[in-house]
């Protein structure tokens, strides 16, 4: 079958590579976000999807908007209409990042078919992986559904489930779901083309929402229970990174491990103490071990190494706080 692929970041590129390699599928065009400033030099660079498409010599379109009446939107309608006339029957979507108007959703016979990183209708929205981790879900998964005008509300064609490990971060979970989900996406597209796919409507009453993540969401409230704080840290690793404040400066916090209260003196929420090889912080229910920390202006490092250079500071048992200087 012939398809268009729409996506932008690294997980989408991983899915695109799989679809290109699948002999049942011909990716005839790719749609992605325009080049953006990335990296330390802040130079304009193509998306990860654009890089994969260009290496495979697949025509690539970088429309900034699909809105009717705009130059890029009108061009998109002409191009996609021509592709439909040439036998393209579906568009596969993975983290595209652009609103797709209804008339464009209707261009292809099987519509625009999206890989979403949750068991819909649970965790509709931009950050389903992070939401599942932060909520303490034990199981998550991926859904293949046909996009309609509502946010992640379309009928579901296929799903897979996956257990969430006790130390899984958002990065870990996103990677594993991408590799499993890309196979499900390919198989579902082919099933649609062969008339074998069965789509089921979602139960809106069971829907939960996962809005876009902002840095403020990753700030640690040390008065919360230890297990909640661990989940927040895992959900925001690697980006934007769980963080806290010490003397008005931001510190990013890496992996947090449970600690036996018998191993350390009683600590108040946010209170920090170091032993020769470990760093502990108090929470609302008991201590956690900080294994990695990123001080201001430095790279992430082992917490014990940081503590060895901060003996005078830590001797006073400082406390991570919740307000920045000037607030």
From Swiss-Prot:
<dbReference type="GO" id="GO:0004479">
    <property type="term" value="F:methionyl-tRNA formyltransferase activity"/>
</dbReference>
<comment type="function">
    <text>Attaches a formyl group to the free amino group of methionyl-tRNA(fMet). The formyl group appears to play a dual role in the initiator identity of N-formylmethionyl-tRNA by promoting its recognition by IF2 and preventing the misappropriation of this tRNA by the elongation apparatus.</text>
</comment>
<dbReference type="InterPro" id="IPR002376">
    <property type="entry name" value="Formyl_transf_N"/>
</dbReference>
<dbReference type="InterPro" id="IPR011034">
    <property type="entry name" value="Formyl_transferase-like_C_sf"/>
</dbReference>
<dbReference type="InterPro" id="IPR005794">
    <property type="entry name" value="Fmt"/>
</dbReference>
<comment type="similarity">
    <text>Belongs to the Fmt family.</text>
</comment>
<dbReference type="InterPro" id="IPR044135">
    <property type="entry name" value="Met-tRNA-FMT_C"/>
</dbReference>
<dbReference type="InterPro" id="IPR041711">
    <property type="entry name" value="Met-tRNA-FMT_N"/>
</dbReference>
<dbReference type="InterPro" id="IPR036477">
    <property type="entry name" value="Formyl_transf_N_sf"/>
</dbReference>
<protein>
    <recommendedName>
        <fullName>Methionyl-tRNA formyltransferase</fullName>
        <ecNumber>2.1.2.9</ecNumber>
    </recommendedName>
</protein>
<dbReference type="Pfam" id="PF02911">
    <property type="entry name" value="Formyl_trans_C"/>
</dbReference>
<dbReference type="GO" id="GO:0005829">
    <property type="term" value="C:cytosol"/>
</dbReference>
<keyword id="KW-0808">Transferase</keyword>
<dbReference type="InterPro" id="IPR005793">
    <property type="entry name" value="Formyl_trans_C"/>
</dbReference>
<dbReference type="Pfam" id="PF00551">
    <property type="entry name" value="Formyl_trans_N"/>
</dbReference>
<keyword id="KW-0648">Protein biosynthesis</keyword>
<feature type="binding site">
    <location>
        <begin position="118"/>
        <end position="121"/>
    </location>
    <ligand>
        <name>(6S)-5,6,7,8-tetrahydrofolate</name>
    </ligand>
</feature>
């Amino acid at each position: 079958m012939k398809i268009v692929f729409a996506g932008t970041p690294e997980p989408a590129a991983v899915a695109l590579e799989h679809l290109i390699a699948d002999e049942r599928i011909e990716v005839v065009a790719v749609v992605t976000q325009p080049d953006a400033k990335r990296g330390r030099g802040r130079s304009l660079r193509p998306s990860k999807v654009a890089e994969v498409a260009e290496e495979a010599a697949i025509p690539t379109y970088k429309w900034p908007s699909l809105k009717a009446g705009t130059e890029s939107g009108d061009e998109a309608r002409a191009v996609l209409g021509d592709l439909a006339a040439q036998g393209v029957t579906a568009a596969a979507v993975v983290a595209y990042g652009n609103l797709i108007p209804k008339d464009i959703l209707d261009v292809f016979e099987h519509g625009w078919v999206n890989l979403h990183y949750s068991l819909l209708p649970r965790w509709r929205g931009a950050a389903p992986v992070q939401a599942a981790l932060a909520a303490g879900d034990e199981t998550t998964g991926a859904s293949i559904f046909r996009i309609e005008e509502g946010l992640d509300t379309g009928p579901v064609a296929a799903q897979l489930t996956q257990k969430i490990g006790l130390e899984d971060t958002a990065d870990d979970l996103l990677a594993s779901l991408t590799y499993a989900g890309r196979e499900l996406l390919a198989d579902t597209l082919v099933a649609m083309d062969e008339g074998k796919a069965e789509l089921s409507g979602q139960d809106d009453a069971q829907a939960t929402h996962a809005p876009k993540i902002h840095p403020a969401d990753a700030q640690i409230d040390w008065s919360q229970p230890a297990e909640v704080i661990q989940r927040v840290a895992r959900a925001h690793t690697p980006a934007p990174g769980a963080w806290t404040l010490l003397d008005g400066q931001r510190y990013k916090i890496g992996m947090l491990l449970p600690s036996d209260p018998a191993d350390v003196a009683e600590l108040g929420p946010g209170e920090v103490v170091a032993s020769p090889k470990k760093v502990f912080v108090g929470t609302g229910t008991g201590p956690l071990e900080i294994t990695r920390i990123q001080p201001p202006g430095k790279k992430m490092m082992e917490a014990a190494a940081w503590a060895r250079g901060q003996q005078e500071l830590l001797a006073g048992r400082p406390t991570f706080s919740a307000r920045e200087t000037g607030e």
